[in-house]
Amino acid sequence: MTSNNKVFTHTDPVLLPVLAELRGREPIFHTPEFGTTRADFEKATAPDYWEASASGRRYSRDFVLRTLDEHPPVNADSVGWESYGHALRRLGPDTYLITYTLRQIERLTRRATIWQSTPQGWRILYHQGTIVSAEEDDAFPSSWLQSPPWLEKR
């Protein structure tokens, strides 16, 4: 069974200008539009920002900023990363969820970032990356075809 990708990549046409603006800032920490200095990163992240990494670990803003100081991020374009399937949903006044798929050299991940527009500019409230197995369908894991979990005897 294949998924209907339109469900995952639909953006209300009214939001397309916002999507274009935020798409230029993703993947976060890896584009010049997002920023390149600690001051840029501090400005672009809310004081209570946190993220859940592709490994499932949770990281605070302070930890992320210290890590970026020690290991400056690579530019996504210069290392051949490709993002696609961008979609945007308004969560509330001036708050948006952008989702997309990121293909890096060594892995494929689904990304989600919650952005907020402020008088000082865009900032992120939360970010998550989830590793995707190449064998998995968007709708459900391929292993479910053989033995759907809801049919297992308990």
Predicted regions and their residues:
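A beta-strand edge to alpha-helix "cap/lid" segment located at domain peripheries
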Residues: 2-43, 48-154
